[in-house]
């Protein structure tokens, strides 16, 4: 056999390699083909989940912001105050803020107000990502996402984040010295930050914050990957409070807290000595925490001094004066127009008419006083129902524990009842079983002993913290309700009216629900709840995401409803408006509170440890 040349040997080897790869590829393709069908459905779910995530982050498919902003820094680069002029904000082409101003002074605590869907969360995101020209030395933290799932316990998570923050500041000090020299004005606040962090006390201070937010000696050691979304939000909040950024942005921080934790957070934030911008729909909380208000209304940011009550009083006075000026000016305009019209061609009056027309033209050029645009007020309404004789819902000596923890009863020998006149508030710290009690009422959970009696015609309507999970966020509200209740009606106009009755109107009905605010999605859930025509309402944190006027409308609807109501809520003002009976859930039972909800709040405030 003649010898094979080296070049031919290489060619043969490459050919064999290609054939081997081809054969392997064929096997791979066959394997992939078998897996492809199984993975198809999963990949569609993943794609939908990613789409929803990107919409919530307000980013396009490439991860770029869907927001368009303008703003000019008017304060000094070295200042801890932030002053911006020419502030504008567009989201998906919709103007949210136009040519406005923003001033955030160090040490002040601002409440950001505005109706659902006006763009408060979008504005906070734009601030947090420095789409506005905020100096780099001002560190910013936005709380709008839970802590990441990890192997770290709640305590370790907060301490680790604090260590990262300390390292970040040390690196920034080093960078500032190299770039600006050791005399830089930026160094003093950085040294203050380092001193305030105090690594020797990391664990003890982190534990105080976590316990204040509702953790106990056991749950503080639980891994974040094993926590529910609500508890992960508390961990993220604890981290934010612990590292104390120069600019702290909190988007509805009380949404996942019980009354006790809300009181603790209110007391803590009262002492926050940096800059805070807070979105909250709890009037009581805003009154307790805020030194200033920013009203996001009519595409403008309007600043007010004082807390929410002070803002409400000042705004009412300003609007009253504005309407007086508007009416006076309109009378003057009508008088001028009437004179001009009556002047006709009379020679002696034509000159006067021209003079008055100039006055009118100047008034218009200078800008006429605009009438006050009233808030959009709509009324929640739960359909009236047939009255049922008592007992409608009764617990007789029940005891309950979860199967995963049979040695620890949540309830023992509990007696409790609900009838058509009930307006019951369940209060108490997280983990004592308030939501569990509602699930026992619905029959979702069954007690191990005792008896639960339900009237044969009772129809329970349930609103929970997880009610929004039923919504397909890739659909519009209009598409979703029509598809879900296709047996009721296929007519879009019918569903427009149904959603409109709960304050979701116009474009809010037709855009994908992932782009709606939490409050707007809540309105969809309430519209669905009303369709079921329940005669007893079980409401678990119904105010989450709702703006203050909407919460007032909800309170009115509950008071006008002729069925029974049981509410779990952290909103003291709602409970003050509706609760006739307050039951404190603790020590494995529910005990009637002899006093008002505000007296209960004062009791909690006395026990706060900071």
UniProtKB/Swiss-Prot annotation:
Further information: Present with 17600 molecules/cell in log phase SD medium.
Oligomeric form and interacting partners: Interacts with LSG1.
Ranges of residues in domain ABC transporter: 82-323, 393-610
Membrane-spanning parts: none
Reactions the enzyme catalyzes: ATP + H2O = ADP + phosphate + H(+)
GO aspect biological process, one term: ribosome biogenesis
Amino-acid positions noted as binding ATP 1 in the UniProt annotation, renumbered to this chain: 114-121
UniProt keyword Nucleotide-binding, yes or no: yes
EC number: 3.6.5.-
Gene Ontology MF annotations: ATP binding; ATP hydrolysis activity
Compartments where found: Cytoplasm; Nucleus
Family: Belongs to the ABC transporter superfamily. ABCF family. EF3 subfamily.
Binding locations of ATP 2: 428-435
Keyword Nucleus recorded: yes
Main location: cytoplasm
Residues recorded as bearing Phosphoserine in the entry: 43, 65, 196
Protein name as annotated: ABC transporter ATP-binding protein ARB1
Disordered: region residues: 1-43
Pfam families, alphabetized: ABC_tran (PF00005), ABC_tran_Xtn (PF12848)
Residues recorded with modification Phosphothreonine: 446
Purpose of the protein: ATPase that stimulates 40S and 60S ribosome biogenesis. Also involved in ribosome-associated quality control (RQC) pathway, a pathway that mediates ubiquitination and extraction of incompletely synthesized nascent chains for proteasomal degradation: localizes to the ribosomal E-site and stimulates VMS1-dependent tRNA cleavage.
Cellular component GO terms held in the UniProt record: cytoplasm; nucleus
InterPro entries: AAA+_ATPase (IPR003593), ABC_tran_Xtn (IPR032781), ABC_transporter-like_ATP-bd (IPR003439), ABC_transporter-like_CS (IPR017871), ABCF_EF3_subfamily (IPR050611), P-loop_NTPase (IPR027417)
Gene for this chain: ARB1
């Amino acid at each position: 056999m003649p010898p094979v040349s080296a070049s031919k040997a290489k060619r043969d080897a490459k050919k064999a390699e290609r054939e081997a790869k081809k054969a392997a590829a064929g096997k791979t393709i066959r394997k992939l083909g078998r897996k492809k069908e199984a993975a198809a459905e999963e990949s569609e779910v993943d794609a939908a989940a990613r789409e929803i995530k990107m919409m919530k982050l307000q980013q396009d498919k490439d991860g770029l912001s869907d927001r368009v902003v303008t703003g000019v820094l008017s304060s000094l680069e070295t200042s801890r105050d932030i002053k911006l002029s020419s502030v504008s904000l567009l989201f998906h082409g919709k103007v949210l803020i136009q040519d406005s101003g923003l001033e955030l002074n160090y040490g002040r605590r601002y409440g950001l107000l505005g109706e659902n869907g006006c763009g408060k969360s979008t504005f906070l995101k734009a601030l947090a990502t420095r789409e506005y020209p905020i100096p780099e030395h001002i560190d910013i933290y936005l709380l709008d996402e839970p802590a990441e799932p990890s192997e770290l316990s709640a305590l370790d998570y907060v301490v680790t984040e604090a260590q990262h923050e300390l390292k970040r500041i040390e690196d920034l000090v080093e960078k500032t010295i190299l770039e600006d020299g050791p005399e830089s004005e930026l160094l003093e606040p950085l040294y203050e930050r380092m001193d305030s962090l105090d690594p020797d006390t990391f664990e003890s201070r982190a534990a105080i914050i976590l316990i204040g937010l509702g953790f106990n000696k056991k749950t503080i050691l639980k891994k974040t990957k094993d926590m529910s979304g609500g508890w992960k939000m508390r961990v993220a909040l604890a981290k934010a409070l612990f590292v104390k950024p120069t600019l702290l942005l909190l988007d509805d921080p009380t949404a996942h807290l019980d009354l006790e934790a809300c009181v603790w957070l209110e007391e803590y934030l009262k002492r926050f000595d940096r800059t805070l911008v807070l979105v909250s729909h709890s009037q009581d909380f805003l009154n307790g925490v805020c030194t200033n208000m920013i009203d996001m209304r009519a595409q403008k940011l309007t600043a007010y001094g004082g807390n929410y009550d002070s803002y409400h009083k000042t705004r009412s006075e300003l609007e009253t004066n504005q309407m007086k000026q508007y009416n006076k000016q309109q009378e003057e305009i009508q008088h001028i127009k009437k004179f001009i019209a009556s002047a006709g061609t009379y020679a002696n009056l034509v000159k006067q008419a021209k003079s008055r027309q100039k006055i009118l033209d100047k008034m218009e050029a200078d800008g006429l006083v605009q009438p006050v645009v009233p808030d959009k007020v709509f009324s929640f309404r739960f359909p009236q129902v047939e009255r049922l004789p008592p007992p409608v819902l009764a617990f007789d000596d029940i005891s309950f524990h979860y199967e995963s923890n049979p040695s620890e009863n949540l309830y023992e020998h509990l007696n409790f009842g609900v009838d058509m006149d009930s307006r019951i508030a369940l209060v108490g710290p997280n983990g004592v079983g308030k939501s569990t009690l509602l699930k026992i009422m619905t029959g979702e959970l069954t007690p191990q002993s005792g008896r639960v009696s339900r009237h044969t015609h009772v129809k329970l309507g349930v609103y929970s913290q997880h009610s929004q999970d039923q919504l397909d966020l890739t659909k519009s509200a209009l598409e979703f309700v029509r598809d879900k209740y296709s047996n009721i009606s296929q007519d879009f106009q019918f569903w427009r009216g149904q959603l409109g009755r709960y304050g979701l109107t116009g474009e809010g009905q037709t855009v994908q629900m992932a782009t709606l605010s939490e409050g707007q999605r809540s309105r969809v859930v309430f519209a669905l709840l009303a369709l079921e025509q329940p005669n007893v309402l079980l409401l678990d944190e119904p105010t989450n995401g709702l703006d203050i006027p909407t919460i007032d409308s909800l309170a009115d609807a509950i008071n006008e409803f002729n069925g029974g109501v049981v509410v779990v809520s952290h909103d003291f003002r709602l409970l003050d408006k509706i609760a006739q009976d307050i039951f404190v859930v603790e020590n494995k039972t529910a005990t009637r509170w002899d006093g008002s909800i505000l007296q209960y709040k004062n009791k909690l405030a006395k026990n706060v440890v900071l």
